Each structure stands twice: as C-alpha cells, then as structure tokens.
Amino acid sequence: MIPLSDGIPSRRFPVVNIALIAANFAVFLFFELPNGEAAVNQASFYPCDVDNACHSALPWGVAWITAMFMHAGWDHILGNMLFLAIFGNNVEDAFGRLGYLVFDFAGGFAAMMLQTGITLLFGTAADAQIPNLGASGAIAAVLGAYIVLYPKSRIRTLLVWFPISIPAWVYLGGWFLYQFFEGKYALLHPSNERGSGVAFFAHVGGFIFGAIVARILLAAGRITPTETQRAAYR
C-alpha cells in the first residue's frame, strides 16, 4: 500500500528531513546516473568487507555512510523518499533537528549491521559480495520511532486504486511484519528469487532500533509529541 499522507501537521519546517531527501536525490542524479555501475561499486557497502576486506573500494567504516545515499533505480529512490517525506517530518519535530540527524545515521548503521550479521552468519560467500545500498534502513528506523510516537495517527494510503485511512500502528505494524516474514522466507529458501536483492533484515533492524530508541527517550521525557500533534490522533 502506498502512503499518501499522515494528517499530522509539522510544528516547524523540517529542515533536516528536507536536506536528507535533497542529498539523496543529488547523489542519485549527479553521481549514480552519470557513472552507473561504477558508482555502485565505489560507494556501496559490501558485507564481506567486514570479514576480510573482499571488495575494499572504501573502508567499510566509511562505506556504510555512503551506501545510505545510494539507490538501485528510480523506483527505489522514489519509494524511499516518499516514506521519508511523509513520516520523517513528525519524527524530526519530536527529536529536534540535531537529534533527528544523529538518530537517522544511527538507525542506518544499526540496520546495516543486522543485515551484515545475518548475511555473514547464514548467507553464502556470494551473498556477502552483493552490494548493500539505500536509505531504507535509516527510514525503517524513522518508521519505528513514528509508530511509538504517533500510533493512532491516521495514514491515508492507496489500497489498489482506492484511498483509505488506517491507524499508523496497523499500517506500520503490517509493514514491519511483511519485512520480517519475507526476510525469514529468504533465509529458509535461499535459492528462491522471491524478494531477491531486498535487504529485509536491514528494514527489520532499523525499525526495531527506532522503536526502542523512541520508547526509551519518550519514557525518559527527552522527546515528546507536541500538543497539536497529540490532538491530531486522539
């Protein structure tokens, strides 16, 4: 289901969220498209680098950052940026600009590390040489924080061709379960091409990280939705 809006107004202009979206498009338009596969080889993250530096275009400690701004095609970047545009602004409101920026990168790192661990433990040597790229792990962390902060927010989405409105906990909870079970299926059926090329456990890891961090900070009173935002989903 494609999300259309969440109905919660931003407290202030989401500077960091817009900057992240702009940076992703800039990298895609001015680095990836002109350079093609060479760009992917140069700036993606390879799980095998953590183990034995099998690719080494960049040190893996740098590549996990550059990989967050790389995408496999127009559908990949448009889908990711749509989710970030809809859900990221309200999470930025709660975390603050600097906190949101740190959270985004930390979520991306957590997502990449879980996917890498799963690949190295259960995958083949060939799997470990497949480039990991995309902002979806960091965005999954944003979704995990959102479901904790705004569980009853109404998400307008397309069901086939019909717009419907459902609670965020249903929409994002369903999204998470889909990622988890598709990832589990991929582990149990490695020769099957269903979901091939999708780093499902990066999505799972990012989402869990985001939800845990948001829950801890919310309980500690370090972050909170504004009164206007609370009123939007009562």
Model-predicted segments: where are they?
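A detector for small-residue-rich transmembrane helices and their helix-helix packing motifs
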Residues: 1-234
